[in-house]
Amino acid sequence: MATIHRPRRGSLAFSPRKRAKSEVPRIRSWVADERAGMAGFAGYKAGMTHVIMIDDRPRSLTEGMEISVPVTVVEVPPMSVAALRVYEPYNGGIRPAGELWAENLSQDLERAITIPKARRGASLEDIESRVDELCEIRVLAHTNPRLLTGVPKKVPDIMEIPVTGRSVEEQLKAAEGLLGSQVAVSNIFNVGEWIDVSAVTKGKGTQGPVKRWGIMLQKRKHSRTGKLRHVGNLGPWHPARISWRVPQLGQTGYHQRTEFNKRIMAIGTNGTDITPDGGFVGYGVVRNEYMLIKGSVPGPVKRLVRMRRAIRPGAAFAPKAPQILYVSKESKQGV
């Protein structure tokens, strides 16, 4: 029998394929930007539609022509900055060196966490006096889902977002201005900018190896045994155990995933400009600020989506605002 050469089915890079610990995605890498302000933002996925725009990709076959582009609508009400947290170098890494909480906190914040009474490093003067010892400034920000009509919850999602700037002093000054305020997405991102999106994907429960790993179905005589959708071989006799590399059934979906280099097509404040007739299926009407992101975004509707500036932007063309001629508002009911 001839030797068969083929790549293995499914990627081991995402193992173990288990449920995400939290629906708030964890982002470990951020762009060192010179612009003073928050390095990321968060919103809630409302649905998808399409736009007609002028193709502005250089050397494209349709450059300068009208093209149809699918977009994802993300509702992004203002985020509230509840605290700032400073970090200092420690053993080759960093560790928290103090934090300062705002005075006018949202009442909904107590639904998510217990606000600390003994606040370490709660004096702004103390933090400013040790600015030479600090290496990074971050803020604790949370969403305001009470403002949303499509997300039926009141408990805010809390996350830590770095503050960018040319120096630690500039970062601290920017964080002081953000403390206790509400930040709009238009203060963070620009139209046409490249961003990365992170979210938890749709959960599909326990699935077999064919759907979970993409293995081939059993062929011809092998399927006559009554087992069609299973892996043909679990491994050798010895070692007398099944390797973790063997594709088997298990949890599928509800994993944290990050997609790189998504283009911001539009940022607006009037949700009626993009809400389809009858509202988005399973979501409703967009009533706050919104973003149109080119392509798809992981997760179902109502899922939290975190965004950051692109950490490895492509060199296709410089970011610029696209020329959008039409946004589809046709009903999505029954589609």
Curated annotation (Swiss-Prot):
Keywords: Ribonucleoprotein, Ribosomal protein, RNA-binding, rRNA-binding. Disulfide bonds: none annotated. It comes from the Archaea. The keyword Signal does not apply. It holds the Pfam family Ribosomal_L3. GO terms for molecular function: rRNA binding; structural constituent of ribosome. GO terms for cellular component: cytosolic large ribosomal subunit. Part of the 50S ribosomal subunit. Forms a cluster with proteins L14 and L24e. Belongs to the universal ribosomal protein uL3 family. One of its GO terms (biological process) is translation. The lineage of its organism: Archaea, Methanobacteriati, Methanobacteriota, Stenosarchaea group, Methanomicrobia. This is Large ribosomal subunit protein uL3. NCBIfam families: L3_arch, PRK04231.1. SUPFAM superfamilies: Translation proteins (SSF50447). One of the primary rRNA binding proteins, it binds directly near the 3'-end of the 23S rRNA, where it nucleates assembly of the 50S subunit. InterPro entries: L3_arc_euk, Ribosomal_L3_dom_3_arc_sf, Ribosomal_uL3, Ribosomal_uL3_arc, Ribosomal_uL3_CS, Transl_B-barrel_sf. Gene3D superfamilies: 3.30.1430.10, Ribosomal protein L3, domain 3, Translation factors. Residues 1-20 are annotated as: Disordered.
